[in-house]
Amino acid sequence: MKKKFICFAILILTAYILLYPADAVNASRNGLMLWYEKVLPTLLPFAIISNVLIHSGYMDALTKHLTKYFRFFMPVSGEGVFILCSGFLFGFPMGSKNCAELLKANKIHPKEAEILFYITNNISPVFIGSYILLQQLQLTGMFGISIFILYVPALILGMLLLYRKKEENRQKKTASQSQITFKIIDAAIMNGFETLVRIGGYIMLFSILISLVEKLPLPKPVLILLENVLEITNGINCLANTDWSIQTKYILAMTATAFGGLSGIAQTSSMVKGTSLSMKKYCLVKLFLTLCTFLLAVAVSVFLF
């Protein structure tokens, strides 16, 4: 069934490119420009630095002092601290990428990696504050509460799951030697570019798919919701240009941001390929956290707008 659906989707996408080549090329260009101007310069440096830290052994030195403070509210290892910081500060898909990298290197227990994988693959606070709130919704003074309703459900779920994790399941580590060589740096650069090129490919494909969806004879509200389900950057832009109330725009924008779009799920799947991390469970948790954010956004809109 899955293979048939994928084959059908490929045929539809190919037919659209052949029938509407100008629109498809324009959508592809827009997607690649978004990747080149926004995603590549933001994520590539950190992708390279993350790989260097993980494979050189310096990550332990960086996180050992932070671990004791994190354990007051979340029982994580030093590697878990690194995943939490990278996932929440630098945003999607660094959380899932670092979970996969540490798991492949056998530097984190699979159970801890699985839990952190569920909760750290979020949209970055910079994107939320600058693009969504200021550029699109033109809302000032909403950054703090927006971060709260997007991140707190994930953090609470993470605390509950990590506290349930049995102590004996913790990974026993031996001290790793810290060294940085040109071989490690070269490998980190190649890994970073491979990761970002893969992300760029998904952004391009989903940009073409959104262009296809816009030609469907569907009511405008349905089209806007569908675009947000597919990819949030273009989806939230379309949402912001409607004449809907600011309450409705805010609720839907926060809900779409929590979900991350099918494009985000596809990119996440490519990051964790070859590991034991379950995409099925990830999607279920993502839907649950999206529902929590939706309810919190409704409550916020009632009291603040």
Which residues does each predicted region cover?
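Membrane-interface helix termini and inter-helical loops of multi-pass transporters
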Residues: 22-33, 138, 219-220
